[in-house]
Swiss-Prot record:
GO BP: retinoic acid metabolic process; retinol metabolic process
Gene Ontology cellular component list: cytosol
PROSITE patterns, A to Z: ADH_ZINC
Binding site for Zn(2+) 1: 47, 69, 175
Gene designation per UniProt: ADH6
Species of origin: Pongo abelii (Sumatran orangutan)
Name of a matching Pfam family: ADH_N
GO function term, MF aspect, one: all-trans-retinol dehydrogenase (NAD+) activity
EC number: 1.1.1.1
Top-level division of the source organism's lineage: Eukaryota
Name of this protein: Alcohol dehydrogenase 6
Residues binding Zn(2+) 2: 99, 102, 105, 113
Length: 375
């Protein structure tokens, strides 16, 4: 029986309040309105962004909410005016929209669509939610809310992909892989023969390693306090790995000693201000580039000596790896299907949605790179 135009009852993982575990609940998902798409979510990754939400009571979020932004699924129905996808299409959800009309979308170097700011309201464009549970409205998250069997997303936050793409794999292209890989390829523009250092070897950092290797870097140094991640990092392209806790000197001094002149391209893939300062200080004084990939706390001010920039170092931000979301994501999926990209090593665990709190523990203890949740 068709569900088009009907309210759908399904399972979702809800955060009822800050610091609480996920609660599996039955929710009601309303039909899509104009320019909206309702999607049957098939697979979604548990990203570091969600881990930061779970680990902080200070983020400016509204509760209760349905998290999740690294998703892939199948279009169930579409609202009035939707023209780029149809029911049955396989799609990837996009936390970063591409409206195609704002100055960032129209600039060849920009990808931070102005419509992203709509996500800060945690509601749809009309100021309402499409989710209810126990008679209570549930807030959206990151334009996507993929920790729900069905979700409603604006058309500009949906990318149609290859009809035979394995959704349990390519969901990583929705955030983690694209963010890290693109930070090396697009933002830093890593050059052949260069030296790179990646601070943080989780899902995003591991993807940075892959991007550095693809760009032709000859020396890729992974930095992490969890030695268990070193084997995987080397498999992905890291030539050396360091644990700062094992060193007798600060990591930036060690990296200078190892390279004589500092690192060409450094990447901070954790979201830690102290690590960012160390990464910047590790860069070659004259032309080194440090790229901020990790999600830094908005409430904390960055304090770095201006002397670090005097000689020529540069610090760059990167969102979604510099990709224009709707334009580039289908191409990345096509590259995966053509075996030009390999996402499989990043996926260390696969669990059902009702095991989401187990996935959280795996992430907290550093036992997984990426856990995929099946819905």
């Amino acid at each position: 029986m068709s569900t088009t135009g009907q309210v759908i009852r399904c399972k979702a993982a809800i955060l009822w309040k800050p610091g609480a575990p996920f609660s599996i609940e039955e929710v009601e998902v309303a039909p899509p309105k104009a320019k909206e798409v309702r999607i049957k979510v098939v697979a979604t990754g548990l990203c570091g962004t969600e881990m930061k939400v779970l680990g902080s009571k200070h983020l400016d979020l509204l509760y209760p909410t349905i998290l999740g932004h690294e998703g892939a699924g199948i279009v169930e129905s579409i609202g009035e005016g939707v023209s780029t996808v149809k029911p049955g299409d396989k799609v990837i959800t996009l936390f970063l929209p591409q409206c195609g009309e704002c100055t960032s979308c129209l600039n060849s170097e920009g990808n931070f669509c102005i419509q992203f700011k709509q996500s800060e309201t945690q509601l749809m464009s009309d100021g309402t939610s499409r989710f209810t549970c126990k008679g209570k409205s549930i807030y959206h998250f990151g334009n996507t809310s993929t920790f729900c069997e069905y979700t409603v997303i604006k058309e500009i936050s949906v990318a149609k992909i290859d009809a035979v793409a394995p959704l349990e794999k390519v969901c990583l292209i929705s955030c983690g892989f694209s963010t890290g890989f693109g930070a090396a390829i697009n933002t830093a523009k890593v050059t052949p023969g260069s030296t790179c250092a990646v601070f943080g070897l989780g899902g995003v950092g591991s993807s940075v390693v892959m991007g550095c290797k693809a760009a032709g870097a000859t020396r890729i140094i992974g930095v992490d306090v969890n030695k268990e991640k070193f084997k995987k990092a080397r498999e992905l392209g890291a030539t050396e790995c360091l644990n700062p806790q094992d060193l007798k000197k600060p990591i930036q001094e060690v990296l200078f000693d190892m390279t004589d002149a500092g690192i060409d391209f450094c990447f901070e893939a954790i979201g830690n201000l102290d690590v960012l300062a160390a990464a910047l200080a590790s860069c070659n004084e004259s032309y080194g580039v440090c790229v901020v990939v990790g999600l830094l706390p908005a409430s904390v001010q960055l304090k770095i000596s201006g002397q670090l920039f005097f000689s020529g170092r540069s610090l760059k931000g990167s969102v979604f790896g510099g990709w224009k979301s709707r334009q580039h994501i289908p191409k990345l999926v096509a590259d995966y299907m053509a075996k030009k990209l390999n996402l499989d090593p990043l996926i260390t665990h696969t669990l059902n949605l009702d095991k989401i709190n187990e996935a959280v523990e795996l992430m907290k203890t550093g036992k997984c790179i990426r856990c995929i949740l099946l819905l």
